[in-house]
Amino acid sequence: GYSKHMEKDENATIKSYNACEKILNKLLKKYKGSVFNTAGDSVLAEFPSAVNAVECGVDFQNEIKKRNESDKTDVKLEFRLGINMGDVVKKEDNLIGDGVNIAARLEALAQPNGISISKSVYDFVVPKTKMTFNDLGVQKVKQNEFHAFDILLDPSQKRKLNTKSKLNLPAIGAIVSAVLLGMIGFL
């Protein structure tokens, strides 16, 4: 994970993080996302539509994959993304609420270099995109229960999780959350 990279080679990790952040900022601008909060290695962002959030996430993961393949250092940062659409409350310069919490749980559920989305996002993007999805069924993470899907960036990412099983997944990393909430997590 991110902490292990920092312990091993702080300078290379910061350099890699900055390069990934540049990619994220470029894509946030392209897809009209706005950052509402950052905490350590997390980012909370809002998007004007589910399609924008998902396309931003897919482009981000693809660009990070290309970057990691061409990078000569040992520091290959990987990310988990969770995208939800739900109610949030704006508190000062931050977004809080159940919509954010579920996006965080989706981020924790996502595979390394993967994207997990809620059913509400899935229902919006399926008719408007040509992406492939894997139905994970109803998942329970901490106190949240929700229907989740993986976006398959690569067919080898397909996995099966027990439905209605309690997952004890650490909330690793970053968040690109939105009203459409997309969470990006560092590994």
Regions found by a protein language model. Give the residues of each.
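Active-site/binding-pocket entry motifs
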Residues: 1, 89, 155-157
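Catalytic NTP-binding/metal-coordinating core of nucleotidyl cyclase/transferase enzymes
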Residues: 1-56, 63
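Bimodal feature
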Residues: 12, 19, 23, 52, ...
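Noncatalytic linker/hinge segments flanking ATPase motor cores
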Residues: 32-40, 120-127, 155-160
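Catalytic beta-strand-to-alpha-helix segment of the class III nucleotidyl cyclase homology domain
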Residues: 44-146, 150
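Long, domain-scale regions corresponding to catalytic signaling modules most often appended to membrane systems
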Residues: 151-186
